[in-house]
């Protein structure tokens, strides 16, 4: 599969690393949405990784970012983004801003991204980083992700980047009819669920085994 055009390799040596990441880690494992591939190729993942882990910025593994949190491996970011079925007009809610990498990927595709982070310092760092990269379609909130962000609901897609042991009811309520919820659920044996909301039901489209950090928040008991 051909990749979409990207920036000049000479101007940014990490472009080649992103090209290789997308070909070897993303396309090779079945993610093929052109918008998702273009976003992963465009966003400089190394800008979201601690200085001490720069040599692993484009490796196929999660990395610690402090405060007990991680940046997900590139494949999981791609899988979740593709599963959300985004369009250029989508309004997306992300639970767990973390370092901001997933928010950047979403912002490359969707019209608006609303992201909630419970750890104030992570939220501030992510906002500074994303604004420095020029993103103007991301809205930020420091708060309890379990409760979502009802002010701007409903959302066409909701992505959760930490695992509760059950599906948070507020998120189900804030998902638009026709929208997708992508969420890891469980404690020891987690699965990443892709749920589609219809006018009468919530349908499971697919699920894979995963391991995410636990969801934190006052409503959740952490």
From Swiss-Prot:
This is Protein-L-isoaspartate O-methyltransferase. InterPro entries: PCMT, SAM-dependent_MTases_sf. Pfam families: PCMT. One of its GO terms (biological process) is protein modification process. The active site is at residue 72. It comes from Picosynechococcus sp. (strain ATCC 27264 / PCC 7002 / PR-6). Keywords: Cytoplasm, Methyltransferase, S-adenosyl-L-methionine, Transferase. One of its GO terms (molecular function) is protein-L-isoaspartate (D-aspartate) O-methyltransferase activity. PANTHER family: PROTEIN-L-ISOASPARTATE O-METHYLTRANSFERASE (PTHR11579), PROTEIN-L-ISOASPARTATE(D-ASPARTATE) O-METHYLTRANSFERASE (PTHR11579:SF0). Its main location: cytoplasm. GO terms for cellular component: cytoplasm. Catalyzes the methyl esterification of L-isoaspartyl residues in peptides and proteins that result from spontaneous decomposition of normal L-aspartyl and L-asparaginyl residues. It plays a role in the repair and/or degradation of damaged proteins. Signal peptide: none annotated. Belongs to the methyltransferase superfamily. L-isoaspartyl/D-aspartyl protein methyltransferase family. Its EC number is 2.1.1.77.
């Amino acid at each position: 599969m051909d990749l979409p055009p990207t920036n000049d390799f000479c101007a940014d040596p990490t472009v080649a690393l992103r090209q290789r990441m997308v070909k070897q880690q993303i396309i090779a494992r079945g993610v093929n949405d052109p918008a998702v591939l273009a976003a992963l190729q465009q966003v400089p993942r190394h800008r979201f990784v601690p200085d001490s882990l720069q040599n692993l910025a484009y490796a196929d593994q999660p990395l610690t970012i402090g405060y007990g949190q991680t940046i997900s491996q590139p494949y999981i970011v791609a899988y979740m983004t593709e599963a959300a079925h985004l369009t250029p007009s989508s309004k997306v809610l992300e639970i767990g801003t973390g370092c901001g990498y997933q928010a950047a990927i979403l912002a490359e595709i969707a019209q608006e991204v609303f992201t909630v982070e419970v750890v104030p310092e992570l939220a501030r760092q992510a906002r500074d980083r994303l604004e420095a990269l020029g993103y103007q379609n991301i809205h930020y909130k420091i708060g309890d992700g379990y409760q979502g962000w009802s002010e701007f609901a409903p959302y066409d897609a909701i992505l959760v980047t930490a695992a509760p042991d059950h599906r948070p009811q507020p998120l189900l309520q804030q998902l638009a009819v026709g929208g997708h919820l992508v969420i890891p659920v469980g404690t020891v044996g987690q699965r990443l669920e892709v749920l589609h909301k219809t006018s009468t039901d919530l349908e499971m489209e697919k699920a894979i085994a995963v391991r995410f950090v636990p969801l934190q928040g006052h409503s959740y008991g952490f």
